[in-house]
Amino acid sequence: DSLIESNIRSTVIELCEQTGVYQAELDPITTVSGIYEYDLEPPADTAVHKIMWVLYNGDALEPISTTLLEERKPKWREPSYYGTPEYFVKQSRTLFYLVPVPNETTANSTRLRVQLKPLHTSTSCSDDIMDDHREAIVNGTLFRLLRMPNREWSDLRGADVYRQIY
């Protein structure tokens, strides 16, 4: 039933977002001189929820927000400020920035560990996540289903019990 599948999917997505249980290292990225914007390429049917860490040539980069970046380094896009990256910015679920803008092209220079979540259109998730967190997924799904109003199975008290143990 698509209603049940949809609620299982929503529970798994929420579990991954809130707990960080679904993580992976992405393939190394080659940086290109003068380019600061890079694609996040997670496994199929997943999205990057959060960047856990970024290494540039083995050195850890500091996460920074776009607002703080513009305050600290307002001219960071100008060629005279290019250099060795010190910061990363998660711009969207598909893009991140390196700052300063790299001043050299270096193969496989950048490594990332990310927190993943399934897409809302996905039909599967990592077996490890589904197996290791089966009980939480079942409890979260039952909470979601039982709290639906005006259904023959609606049970707000039961939903509250499953919410507490989820």
Regions inferred by a protein language model and the residue ranges of each:
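Glycine-enriched, solvent-exposed interface loops adjoining structured elements
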Residues: 1-166
